[in-house]
Swiss-Prot record:
Changing L45A: Loss of interaction with EIF4E. Repressor of translation initiation that regulates EIF4E activity by preventing its assembly into the eIF4F complex: the hypophosphorylated form competes with EIF4G1/EIF4G3 and strongly binds to EIF4E, leading to repression of translation. In contrast, the hyperphosphorylated form dissociates from EIF4E, allowing interaction between EIF4G1/EIF4G3 and EIF4E, leading to initiation of translation. Inhibits EIF4E-mediated mRNA nuclear export. It comes from Homo sapiens. Keywords: Cytoplasm, Nucleus, Phosphoprotein, Protein synthesis inhibitor, Translation regulation. Expression is highest in skeletal muscle, heart, kidney, and pancreas, whereas there is very little expression in brain and thymus. One of its GO terms (molecular function) is eukaryotic initiation factor 4E binding. It comes from the Eukaryota. Residues 85-100 have a biased composition (Acidic residues). This is Eukaryotic translation initiation factor 4E-binding protein 3. The gene is EIF4EBP3. A motif (YXXXXLphi motif) lies at residues 40-46. Interacts with EIF4E. Interacts with RPA2 (in unphosphorylated form via N-terminus); the interaction enhances EIF4EBP3-mediated inhibition of EIF4E-mediated mRNA nuclear export. It is found in: Cytoplasm; Nucleus.
Length: 100
């Protein structure tokens, strides 16, 4: 005969898990829109992380400098441009001279 044990139902929010699709061992459960159940083992997911395909970006990514492609100008050049802009600002002289 099999023996079973009971455990209390969690009462507070702090006792509930953050994600209902994972287990403490790292197994991930998912379903497709058609209802197919997919089980990903932790070991398999860690192996996929190091595969060459995972390190290759998708082909249709938009070109966003600094996000999907390297920045167009190094930060030092951007800082130089900001310094030039501050030097070219109009001085704070009185706009109108008034005789009192």
């Amino acid at each position: 005969m099999s023996t079973s044990t009971s455990c209390p139902i969690p009462g507070g929010r702090d006792q509930l898990p953050d994600c209902y699709s994972t287990t403490p061992g790292g197994t991930l459960y998912a379903t497709t829109p058609g209802g197919t159940r997919i089980i990903y083992d932790r070991k398999f997911l860690l192996e996929c992380k190091n595969s060459p395909i995972a390190r290759t970006p998708p082909c249709c990514l938009p070109q966003i400098p600094g996000v999907t492609t390297p920045p167009t100008a190094p930060l030092s050049k951007l800082e130089e441009l900001k310094e030039q802009e501050t030097e070219e600002e109009i001085p704070d002289d009185a706009q109108f001279e008034m005789d009192i």
